[in-house]
């Protein structure tokens, strides 16, 4: 697969992730859209293979971080936030254990 195709694929993946993570939050959706587009536009003329690979790694890491670590919070009161976790965030939830076992 060509490098341009991989870059475009990452661009689309970041936008899809943005839409899932910031669903129903117009301000965050717009800010993320602008930032993604800005970063890709700023590096559009990059020709160094090493630099492009580095930038793609950063983009992939950002996508993973957004997908696995960001949770929405909605202000419900003056000092209260309602957290809205996505289902994919709760998949690897490990229950609390008072007596952890030793690793062997």
Curated annotation (Swiss-Prot):
Location of this chain's protein in the cell: Mitochondrion matrix
InterPro entries for this protein: Complex1_LYR_dom, Complex1_LYR_LYRM7, MZM1/LYRM7
Modified residues (Phosphoserine): 60
Keywords of the record: Chaperone, Disease variant, Mitochondrion, Phosphoprotein, Primary mitochondrial disease
A Gene Ontology cellular-component term: mitochondrial matrix
A molecular-function term among this protein's GO annotations: protein folding chaperone
Keyword Cytoplasm assigned: no
Top-rank taxon, per record: Eukaryota
A UniProt-annotated Pfam family: Complex1_LYR
Keyword check for Nucleus: no
GO BP term, example: mitochondrial respiratory chain complex III assembly
Main localisation: mitochondrion
Disulfide bonds: none
Role: Assembly factor required for Rieske Fe-S protein UQCRFS1 incorporation into the cytochrome b-c1 (CIII) complex. Functions as a chaperone, binding to this subunit within the mitochondrial matrix and stabilizing it prior to its translocation and insertion into the late CIII dimeric intermediate within the mitochondrial inner membrane.
Assigned protein family: Belongs to the complex I LYR family.
Disease annotated for this entry: Mitochondrial complex III deficiency, nuclear type 8: A form of mitochondrial complex III deficiency, a disorder of the mitochondrial respiratory chain resulting in a highly variable phenotype depending on which tissues are affected. Clinical features include mitochondrial encephalopathy, psychomotor retardation, ataxia, severe failure to thrive, liver dysfunction, renal tubulopathy, muscle weakness and exercise intolerance.
Subunit structure: Interacts with UQCRFS1.
UniProt-recorded name of the protein: Complex III assembly factor LYRM7
Species per Swiss-Prot/TrEMBL record: Homo sapiens
Taxonomy of the source species: Eukaryota, Metazoa, Chordata, Craniata, Vertebrata
């Amino acid at each position: 697969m060509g490098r341009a195709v991989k870059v475009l694929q990452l661009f689309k993946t970041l936008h899809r992730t943005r839409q899932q993570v910031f669903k129903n939050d117009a301000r965050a959706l717009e800010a993320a859209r602008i930032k993604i587009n800005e970063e890709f536009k700023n590096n559009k003329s990059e020709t160094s293979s090493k630099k492009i690979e580095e930038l793609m790694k950063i983009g992939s890491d950002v996508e993973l971080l957004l997908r696995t670590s960001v949770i929405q919070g909605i202000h419900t009161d003056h000092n209260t936030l309602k957290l809205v976790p996505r289902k994919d965030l709760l998949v690897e939830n490990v229950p609390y254990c008072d007596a952890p076992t030793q690793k062997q």
